[in-house]
Amino acid sequence: MFQLSVQDIHPGEKAGDKEEAIRQVAAALVQAGNVAEGYVNGMLAREQQTSTFLGNGIAIPHGTTDTRDQVLKTGVQVFQFPEGVTWGDGQVAYVAIGIAASSDEHLGLLRQLTHVLSDDSVAEQLKSATTAEELRALLMGEKQSEQLKLDNEMLTLDIVASDLLTLQALNAARLKEAGAVDATFVTKAINEQPLNLGQGIWLSDSAEGNLRSAIAVSRAANAFDVDGETAAMLVSVAMNDDQPIAVLKRLADLLLDNKADRLLKADAATLLALLTSDDAPTDDVLSAEFVVRNEHGLHARPGTMLVNTIKQFNSDITVTNLDGTGKPANGRSLMKVVALGVKKGHRLRFTAQGADAEQALKAIGDAIAAGLGEGA
């Protein structure tokens, strides 16, 4: 994981416009020995090609491929502008993270930062922070509680099972492996009868042994009988804060609407969307899957091209990295798209709902096939 030094963070700075802000960041990169004097020209040129504004008040100015020879060593400089700097199209940046990288070394850092910065509350804290130490803690995620663990790694779907104990053991093992529970939780979760929520869904938890919030889901290939009641899926919850409540509410809503069968039929990505997103696909949604061929995945430039393509349409569009966490993201947010951690060869599923959904998916597919501004 990239380590950010407080010496690389500059709180309380001022800039009259975007160009002045970029020049300040470039000068700091030169001073730190990251780049030569000519790198600033690449940073300004990059901004002319594609805005480096990520969203949530964050911009990531960096050079073009033509100025990679100006990079002496990979590094970043973070500038905070409490009064804000207009970054174009009504966008205001309060934090600019200047990046110097000669290859794709910065992509891991970028994904690390976007996972932190995609939290709206953290972005607001970055704006109001007053010290380099506070900014560093926010950027490195040290002030964040661990996010709810519910992704592809927590799912066991369509297994051969004829009793709840099999599902209980699988979920307990997943939670233990994720560091979410201790041995006490595992013992209780396996020995105590889960709660029947109805429609084939059962729930398991424990008041003891919760180390972090996480949810594991196991689903049988075929429903089976438990003392005259139907069982098909078990949801096991480790609760160390209130994060699981939102998931349980979505689950309750599906049950109240008699739509729990959607969970029993869904693939992994759709199941995660139903439990973790308020923008989960409905029955009338269209979807399509495409493979990213860009050498360095979806970093800022191709990510921007993708988001700009999506913004041409009125439909609600989400994107899921099927080779990542499996959670859907708002396709109109560059920050959330970059945070998906898309690498070359990863499969993306797009869902679109609206009058122009079909046209949107075709345009997205064409844009990806064309290389998202980097050539096919």
UniProtKB/Swiss-Prot annotation:
Keywords: Cytoplasm, Kinase, Phosphoprotein, Phosphotransferase system, Sugar transport, Transferase, Transport
Induction info: Induced by fructose and repressed by FruR.
InterPro entries: HPr-like, HPr-like_sf, PTrfase/Anion_transptr, PTS_EIIA_type-2_dom, PTS_HPr_His_P_site, PTS_HPr_Ser_P_site, Sugar_PTS
CDD domains from the UniProt entry: PTS-HPr_like, PTS_IIA_fru
BP term (GO), one: fructose import across plasma membrane
Active-site residues, record numbering mapped to chain: H62, H299
An annotated Gene Ontology molecular function: kinase activity
Coiled coil (residue ranges): none
Sequence segments annotated as region (M domain): 156-284
One annotated Gene Ontology cellular component of this protein: plasma membrane
Keyword GTP-binding applies: no
Domain notes: The PTS EIIA type-2 domain is phosphorylated by phospho-HPr on a histidyl residue. Then, it transfers the phosphoryl group to the PTS EIIB type-2 domain.
Entry function: The phosphoenolpyruvate-dependent sugar phosphotransferase system (sugar PTS), a major carbohydrate active transport system, catalyzes the phosphorylation of incoming sugar substrates concomitantly with their translocation across the cell membrane. The enzyme II FruAB PTS system is involved in fructose transport.
Protein name, UniProt field: Multiphosphoryl transfer protein
